[in-house]
Amino acid sequence: VKHTLGYFKALKKGGAYTKDDYIELLSMLFMVFKLARTKGWLAMEQHIENPHDSELFKQFPAFHHNHHATTFLCDYLRIISLGNENPLTIEALMDEEIETIKEHESHPGHAVQTMADGIPALGIVAAVLGVIKTMSSISEPPEILGKMIGGALVGTFLGVWLAYGMVGPIAGAMTSYAATEVMYYRAIKVGVIAFLNGCAPQVAVEFARKFLPHDVQPTFQELEEKLNALPSPTA
């Protein structure tokens, strides 16, 4: 219930993450990959074990304050630093976890959609109750019966309108919002796997950039400008 109520508030944003959030994410991945490439995975150990105290991650506040995303990335960096640098193994595991995240994030949309599916039935029940009440007044003149039957049918109309004109679209918006939430984790995965496959740090984040939808995808020039302004990573 708390998760669903949180989604109602989040719908005002349109999407879970903006273009600026993704520029920051890609910049952070670039710093991580550059540090790992120049100083080795052991240099990442202090950042992996204490991400909330990491000076590296503190440079990227949106990511740093995202507990779930921080844990997601650091868990895989830890596995890699322990010696498992097989991209196929890491990708398979990341896919499994992302699928779990997707299922979790889809719960609010499914809950509201289930409610939307049941609302027309409530309208029908209201209509039937109205007809039953009308039948008890069958001896009344037609103009009275017409009003009573019309009142009964309002229940059906209201149920259909609420289901397909209000609650259903809200459920759809929640499902779309959940997809934007999951996209953040998939972008992390694409960057990490590209780096494990031997790509240079800048090429790895370019893979992640190209994966993003156009409405939040920074241009090559926007990202390059940001990367060029970053300080050199330190252990």
Question: Could you tell me what each predicted segment is?
Answer:
Residues 93, 97-176:
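Helix-termination/interfacial motifs at the ends of transmembrane alpha-helices
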Residues 1-108, 180-235:
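Large intracellular
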